Amino acid sequence: DRSVSRGLGDVYKRQIMDYSIRDAKEAGFNKVVFIIRKDIFEEFEEIIGSRIKDQIDVEYVFQELDDLPEGFEVPEGRTKPWGTGQAVLCCKDVVKEPFVIINADDYYGKEAFVKLHDFLVSGEDLGREFTMGMAGFILKNTLSDNGTVTRGVSVVDENGLLSQVHETTGIMMGEDGKIKCDLPDVQEWISPEDKVSMNMWAAYPEFLEFLAEDFKTFLSEVEEGDLKKEYLLPNIVDKLLKEGRANVKVLETQDRWFGVTLSLIHI
């Protein structure tokens, strides 16, 4: 992933971003914030941003390994990015409105954008410190013909609220028509009809304020010598659920996913 032409210049990925931004704009969103590395900015802007800015307002923020809170340093030998939680945190100073988080190389379909937009503008209060939304895809609609996938396998209560999310690797459809995965506990109950997170979340600016403090907690708990631990959105949301600080409305979408890194679109 050292080369923009290899990592971002490929036509397929550009088309996915074009479709997602078109769908977001049609749903009512009016700005996109691209979260990228600073060293690819010029080529990214030339290949993608220059076309997109004629359709929708565009801003950029940079996710860098050394963009850490005061008092923290990058562990010697670490090269792996800090994860999707830090990526979204990078937007704190430019996003002051309700927003939706997406992966730039996943195509989500129109329905998810419409449902999350309408949820945000409704101002629905779910009764806890943080009100959030999640696009709930049907697991069988998000499988790949090219191997296993990682999904946030979700448990949804009778009120349509997220009660648990399990970041699960190695998901595939077995020859017997049953879902297989790497987590033994999840394997006991996982089914093709389960709702899964595709990292498409709806939130309000106060969530970014929370990330700013919680990222410090995460960094303080990284064990010495661990050069790969990541600050990931599904784990962050699961933590808020377990602490009783958030309610997350699951908005089901029947659209089929396809994908080929993190972007944020807001109202």
Model regions and ranges:
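Short beta-strand segments
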Residues: 61, 101-103, 133-138, 252
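A C-terminal functional module that forms or caps the active site or interfaces directly
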Residues: 212-216, 222-245
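A short acidic, often aromatic-flanked loop/helix-cap motif at beta-alpha or helix-coil junctions
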Residues: 65-70, 140-142, 171-173, 257-258
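Catalytic beta-strand/loop signature of glycosyltransferases that borders the donor
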Residues: 195, 249-255
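Single conserved hydrophobic/aromatic residue that forms the stacking wall/gate
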Residues: 1-12, 266
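A conserved hydrophobic position in a structured secondary element of the catalytic/binding core
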Residues: 36, 202-203, 261
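Conserved core of the sugar-phosphate nucleotidyltransferase
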Residues: 110-201, 205
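Conserved N-terminal catalytic core of the sugar/cofactor nucleotidyltransferase
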Residues: 14-103, 108-115, 122, 127
